[in-house]
Amino acid sequence: MAEFEHVTVLLHEAVALLAINPTGTYVDATLGGGGHTGEILKQLTTGKLYSFDQDDTAIKYNQTRYADEIAAGKLILIHQNFRQLKVALAEQHVTAVDGIVYDLGVSSVQFDDGQRGFSYNYDAELDMRMDQRQTLTAKTIVNDWPFNDILRVLSRYGEDRFPKQVARKIEQHRDKGPINTTFELVDIIKEAIPAPARRKGGHPAKRTFQALRVAVNDELGALEDSLTQALELLAPSGRISVITFQSLEDRLVKQMFREKTSMPDLPAGLPVLPGQFEPDYKLLTRKPILPSETEMTDNHRSESAKLRGIERQ
């Protein structure tokens, strides 16, 4: 079993935003190495925590790490994608919760495990599946999907400056034979991107790998589905805290929270009494909470992190 050495970002800030009730019911939608789960468990007395992860490695690791809490019925691990939030909780007879935390960063363990195919720094099969039970892999996308579909993925999810060039080069190479490994794909990307652009802005394969990972795991679709359910599951005064690491996710969270906390559109001239049309939710963070300078120095992966929160009225 892989040892989780994942450093949880904005650990205390994300949990503090939930204002934990020791007897409440909580959800960690992204169990990972169990950092947020552990922090919530410390603050619970008779409360319960339901922690989700689609990654079998994370579930097995935390079954050992939190064996006592699981045996005591304080922690329930759920091996599901967080888009199954409502269904999975209903199976546990839970229909309302007091708080939910999301940490949308890919686990360091997933990046650093060369066999998972997430990283352009390790040579491995082009996999990128968070959930090993699913069939779609990055290898399937680059070898079997039409040019226009690959172009759409690179443009939409990678925010790439050269999506057409990369997609075209992938098409040319796969005509000669299948693209099987991460390093094969890295070489193709380097070949596609103009030399001056390769020398700045980080690793040239970064955005392409991000785009493929998001597509393989339908990350944005799953996030939107899950947040929609999470907002409905919140009890009055219940809270959600979300840590994002890239602009696509942050934009989605910001937009969904803004829609839920805005006044409804009303006909012009309609007499409205104060408090008559209050939104059901309020923002806890007008601007996102960012990591401290110390945290960013100690953990460079935290640099892009943003924390947002919302509360049900």
Curated annotation (Swiss-Prot):
Enzyme class, spelled out: transferase
PANTHER family: 12S RRNA N4-METHYLCYTIDINE METHYLTRANSFERASE, S-ADENOSYL-METHYLTRANSFERASE MRAW
Sequence ranges of Basic and acidic residues compositional bias: 297-313
This protein's name: Ribosomal RNA small subunit methyltransferase H
UniProt xrefs under Pfam families: Methyltransf_5 (PF01795)
Binding sites annotated in the UniProt record for S-adenosyl-L-methionine: 34-36, 53, 82, 103, 110
S-adenosyl-L-methionine found in the keyword field: yes
Molecular functions per Gene Ontology: rRNA (cytosine-N4-)-methyltransferase activity
